[in-house]
């Protein structure tokens, strides 16, 4: 009835316009039933399809967020480990340079010790040789002196043809040689 009254109002105001309202709402009870069925269908579909779909999307979003945060954390840890490795590498390089310098210094010290030791041994050998030469020279001088004394005694004996006491003669000759020196 309401619909008929509505129809009358529309028809009375617009006369030449086709009956649009009648074609849109041919039967009001059918329209209300369709409207209620559509609302119920939307509610049922919302509960059966939309909410599980929304929950699934939220779970996927949460998984993606977890994976991204885990990836960021792992990337951060990897960057920290790379920095630590670089620091360790730099420390190793510095230590190797230090070890090389120390080894060179130690080698130089050992070289100098060996050279000093060799020089000392050479000086000792040279000193020993000089002492040996001096001793041999003294020996040779004594031998020459003794030979000269013996020659002088023999010569004097031959000249004088008589034998003088050998000790006295020897003393005379030694005094003569000392005077020559």
Curated annotation (Swiss-Prot):
Q: Name one GO cellular component term.
A: plasma membrane
Task: Name the membrane topology term.
Answer: Single-pass membrane protein
User: What molecular functions are annotated in GO for this chain?
Assistant: proton-transporting ATP synthase activity, rotational mechanism; proton-transporting ATPase activity, rotational mechanism
Q: Which keywords has UniProt assigned to this entry?
A: ATP synthesis, Cell membrane, CF(0), Hydrogen ion transport, Ion transport, Membrane, Transmembrane, Transmembrane helix, Transport
State whether keyword Transmembrane applies.
yes
Q: Which InterPro entries match?
A: ATP_synth_B-like_membr_sf (IPR028987), ATP_synth_b/b'su_bac/chlpt (IPR002146), ATP_synth_F0_bsu_bac (IPR005864), ATP_synthase_B_chain (IPR050059)
Pfam families noted in UniProt: ATP-synt_B
Q: Does this entry carry the keyword Cytoplasm?
A: no
CDD domains given in the database record: ATP-synt_Fo_b
- The main location is membrane
Q: Where does the sequence pass through the membrane? A: 24-44
Subcellular localization, as worded in the UniProt entry? Cell membrane
| Assembly behavior | F-type ATPases have 2 components, F(1) - the catalytic core - and F(0) - the membrane proton channel. F(1) has five subunits: alpha(3), beta(3), gamma(1), delta(1), epsilon(1). F(0) has three main subunits: a(1), b(2) and c(10-14). The alpha and beta chains form an alternating ring which encloses part of the gamma chain. F(1) is attached to F(0) by a central stalk formed by the gamma and epsilon chains, while a peripheral stalk is formed by the delta and b chains.
Q: Identify its protein family.
A: Belongs to the ATPase B chain family.
Q: What does this protein do?
A: F(1)F(0) ATP synthase produces ATP from ADP in the presence of a proton or sodium gradient. F-type ATPases consist of two structural domains, F(1) containing the extramembraneous catalytic core and F(0) containing the membrane proton channel, linked together by a central stalk and a peripheral stalk. During catalysis, ATP synthesis in the catalytic domain of F(1) is coupled via a rotary mechanism of the central stalk subunits to proton translocation.
Q: What is this protein called?
A: ATP synthase subunit b
